[in-house]
C-alpha cells in the first residue's frame, strides 16, 4: 500500500514508513501491495455480548466523522440510504459469502434494516448488526449439527449425475431450511468425494470431515463482540473503497505485528478465500520465495508438522488458526498441501515441504549477477547485469541519525551499478517482479540513478492540491541500456519507478502489467482526540490521496503496461487492483 501512517505521538516530519514497522514517529508513505487483514483479535472464548459497548458506539461516530469529511477522505461518500444498502450487502457477504447459512426467509426479515444502517452508524445505535449476527451464529450451529449427522448416513455412493455448484457468489439465497438441507447434503458429499479422490479411506474421511465441521462451529462460537463490531464498521469502510478499513483496539494493537508475523514461518501473507486460506503475497527472502514453488492465489488445504506424519485438513479454519499451524520454531519443517491458483479447488494438491525461518534484512537486499548471452552471426556475446530488488527498503531510523551505513535500496543498487560498470556489462536489467513496494523516497531516489534530475511522481490530496516529487541530484549512475522487469506482483513504489522510466523513455519495461494500486492511505488513531491512556476506539486506515505518473496518468487499476509483454503468470481477473468492485477509477491530471 502507499500508506501515510500516522500515530498519536507523531509529528509531520517525514514522508516514508518501514514495511517492517508500521508505526513510526514520522508522517510516512508506505508503498506496498495491499494486505488483507480482518482476523479475530485474540483466541478468547467469552460469550458474545447482547449489545455493543458505549465505546463502540462512540467509535462508530468517529469513523463516520472521518469518512464523510473531504478534509480527511480522498473520496468521501455521503452516509445515506444508498450507502446503507451497500453496507447491508457487504455485511451479509462478510458473514455468509457462500450463502450457505442464511435462508431467503432470514434475508426478508433482515431487509427491515436495509435503509437503517446509516442511522445506526451516525447514532451509535448498533443493535441491527448484532441482531443479524445472533441469527447467523444460530444458523451456523444448526448447519454444523446437520453436517456432522450426515457423516453417519449412507449417502456417499457416487453413481448418479448430481452437480454441486462450488462458486455460489451469484446464486440466490436458499428459500428455506429444507433447501439448505439439500445444499448441505450436496456440500458434504462433495467434501467426501474430494477426500476420496485424494486417496483417503472412509473412516479417515469421516474423521477428517467431522473435525473440520466441528472446528468451523467452534471458530464462529469464539467470535467476540469486537469481531462483530469490526466486521460491521468495515462494511461501511469497505464501501468507501477497498483500502479503507477499521481496526478495533486489539486489532490495531496487532496491526503492527501483522507484518512481522508474516515474516516468520514460511514468509507469506495469507488471506481468507471462501472456506480456504490462500496466499496473498510472497515475502522476498523467505522460505516460500526461495522454494519457487508457491505463488499468490495458491490455496492451502492441509498442514503437517515435520518431514513426515499426519497432514491436518485446514479447510474451513479461521485464518489465524491456520497461521498458528504454519508458524513454528526456526529451522523446523512444515508441510503444505497446496492447490495451485490456476487449478480448480477439487484438483489434487501439491505437497510442499518448507523449512521455517525468519527473513533476514540482507536476504531482502538488492543482489546482482552477470549473464553472458550468446549472439548470432559471429558477433561477440553480450554481458548483461541483472539486479534483483525485492523491495524499496530503507532504515528510516538510520537515515534520521545520518548513519554512514544505513540500509537503502538506492544506495545498494548504486553500489551494484558501480560493480557492474567495472565488470563492463553491456546492459542492465532491474528485476522488480513481486516487488510490493516500500519507501516513496527510495522510489524517487532510485529513479534518479537513471535520470539527470526531474519530476518522478505527482500526488493529489483529498482537497485537490497536487505536489510534485522529484529527483534533485545531478548525475547518473548508469547511462547504458536499461530494462525493468515487472509482473502482476509489482505494486506501488515499483509502479512509480517503472512508470517514470517508461515516461522518460529511459528504458524498456518488460514482463506483465503491474498490480495497479495508485492510492495513498493514512492510519488514524481514534484515541488521539480524547488522548486516552488506554486504547478504546481503535484505528481507521483511509485513502487520502492518489499518485500520478510524470505523464499525468494514474497507475490506478491499469497499472504499468509493459513495452514488451510476457505470457502472464497470474490471471489479471483474479489478482490486482482491478479485481476490487469499488476501486477508484483510472484518471489523469
Task: List each model region and its residues.
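Bacterial N-terminal signal peptides that target proteins for export
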Residues: 8-9, 13-27
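Bacterial N-terminal signal peptides
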Residues: 28-36
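Cleft-lining beta-strand/loop regions that shape enzyme active-site pockets
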Residues: 45-52, 70-80, 84, 218-225, ...
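Sec-exported extracytoplasmic/periplasmic mature domains
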Residues: 64-75, 88-100, 115-126, 134-152, ...
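PDZ/PDZ-like domain segments forming the peptide/carboxylate-binding groove
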Residues: 93-94, 115, 129, 134-145, ...
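Extended, domain-scale alpha-helical bundle/helix-rich regions
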Residues: 142-265, 274
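Conserved functional hotspot residues or short segments at active or partner-binding sites
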Residues: 198-211, 550-589
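Polar, glycine-rich mid-to-C-terminal structural blocks
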Residues: 505, 510-575
Amino acid at each position: 500500500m502507499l500508506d501515510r501512517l500516522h500515530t498519536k505521538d507523531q509529528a509531520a516530519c517525514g514522508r516514508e514508513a518501514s514495511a517492517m514497522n508500521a508505526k513510526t514517529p514520522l508522517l510516512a508513505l508506505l508503498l506496498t501491495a495491499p494486505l488483507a487483514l480482518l482476523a479475530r483479535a485474540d483466541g478468547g472464548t467469552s460469550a458474545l455480548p447482547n449489545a455493543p459497548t458505549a465505546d463502540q458506539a462512540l467509535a462508530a461516530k468517529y469513523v463516520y466523522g472521518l469518512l464523510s469529511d473531504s478534509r480527511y477522505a480522498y473520496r468521501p461518500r455521503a452516509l445515506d440510504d444508498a450507502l446503507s444498502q451497500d453496507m447491508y450487502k457487504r455485511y451479509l457477504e462478510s458473514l455468509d459469502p457462500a450463502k450457505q447459512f442464511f435462508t431467503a426467509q432470514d434475508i426478508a426479515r433482515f431487509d427491515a434494516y436495509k435503509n437503517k444502517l446509516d442511522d445506526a452508524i451516525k447514532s451509535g445505535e448498533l443493535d441491527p448488526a448484532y441482531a443479524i449476527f445472533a441469527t447467523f451464529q444460530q444458523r451456523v450451529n444448526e448447519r454444523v449439527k446437520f453436517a456432522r449427522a450426515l457423516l453417519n448416513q449412507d449417502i456417499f455412493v457416487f453413481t448418479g449425475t448430481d452437480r454441486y455448484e462450488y462458486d455460489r457468489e451469484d446464486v440466490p439465497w436458499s428459500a428455506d431450511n429444507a433447501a439448505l438441507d439439500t445444499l448441505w447434503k450436496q456440500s458434504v458429499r462433495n467434501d467426501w468425494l474430494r477426500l476420496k479422490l485424494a486417496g483417503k479411506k472412509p473412516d479417515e474421511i469421516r474423521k477428517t470431515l467431522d473435525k473440520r465441521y466441528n472446528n468451523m462451529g467452534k471458530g464462529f462460537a469464539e467470535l467476540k463482540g469486537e469481531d462483530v463490531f469490526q466486521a460491521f464498521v468495515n462494511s461501511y469502510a469497505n464501501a468507501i473503497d477497498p483500502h479503507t478499513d477499521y481496526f478495533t483496539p486489539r486489532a490495531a494493537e496487532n496491526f503492527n505485528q501483522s507484518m512481522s508475523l508474516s515474516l516468520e514461518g514460511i514468509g507469506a501473507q495469507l488471506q481468507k478465500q471462501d472456506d480456504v486460506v490462500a496466499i496473498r503475497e510472497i515475502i522476498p527472502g523467505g522460505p516460500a520465495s526461495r522454494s519457487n514453488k508457491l505463488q499468490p492465489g495458491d490455496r492451502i488445504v492441509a498442514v503437517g508438522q515435520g518431514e513426515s506424519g499426519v497432514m491436518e485438513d485446514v479447510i474451513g479454519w479461521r485464518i489465524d488458526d491456520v497461521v498458528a499451524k504454519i508458524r513454528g520454531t526456526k529451522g523446523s519443517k512444515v508441510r503444505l498441501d497446496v492447490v495451485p491458483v490456476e487449478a480448480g479447488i477439487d484438483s489434487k494438491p501439491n505437497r510442499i515441504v518448507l523449512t521455517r525461518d525468519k527473513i533476514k534484512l540482507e536476504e531482502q537486499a538488492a543482489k546482482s549477477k552477470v549473464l553472458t548471452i550468446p549472439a548470432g552471426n559471429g558477433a561477440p556475446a553480450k554481458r548483461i547485469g541483472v539486479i534483483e530488488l525485492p523491495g524499496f527498503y530503507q532504515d528510516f531510523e538510520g537515515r534520521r541519525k545520518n548513519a554512514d551505513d544505513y540500509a537503502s535500496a538506492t544506495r545498494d543498487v548504486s553500489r551494484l551499478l558501480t560493480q557492474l560498470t567495472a565488470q563492463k556489462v553491456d546492459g542492465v536489467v532491474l528485476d522488480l517482479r513481486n516487488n510490493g513496494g516500500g519507501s516513496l523516497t527510495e522510489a524517487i531516489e532510485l529513479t534518479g540513478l537513471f535520470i539527470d534530475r526531474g519530476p518522478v511522481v505527482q500526488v493529489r490530496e483529498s482537497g485537490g492540491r497536487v505536489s510534485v516529487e522529484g529527483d534533485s541530484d545531478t548525475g547518473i549512475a548508469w547511462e547504458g541500456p536499461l530494462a525493468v522487469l515487472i509482473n502482476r506482483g509489482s505494486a506501488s513504489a515499483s509502479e512509480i519507478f517503472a512508470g517514470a522510466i517508461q515516461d522518460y523513455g529511459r528504458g524498456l519495461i518488460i514482463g506483465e502489467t503491474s498490480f495497479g494500486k495508485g492510492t495513498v492511505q493514512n492510519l488514524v488513531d481514534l484515541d488521539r482526540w480524547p488522548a486516552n491512556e488506554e486504547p478504546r476506539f481503535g484505528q481507521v486506515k483511509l485513502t487520502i490521496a492518489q499518485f500520478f505518473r510524470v505523464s499525468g496518468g494514474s497507475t490506478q487499476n491499469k497499472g504499468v503496461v509493459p513495452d514488451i509483454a510476457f505470457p502472464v503468470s497470474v490471471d489479471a481477473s483474479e489478482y490486482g487492483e482491478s479485481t476490487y468492485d469499488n476501486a477508484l477509477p483510472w484518471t489523469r491530471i
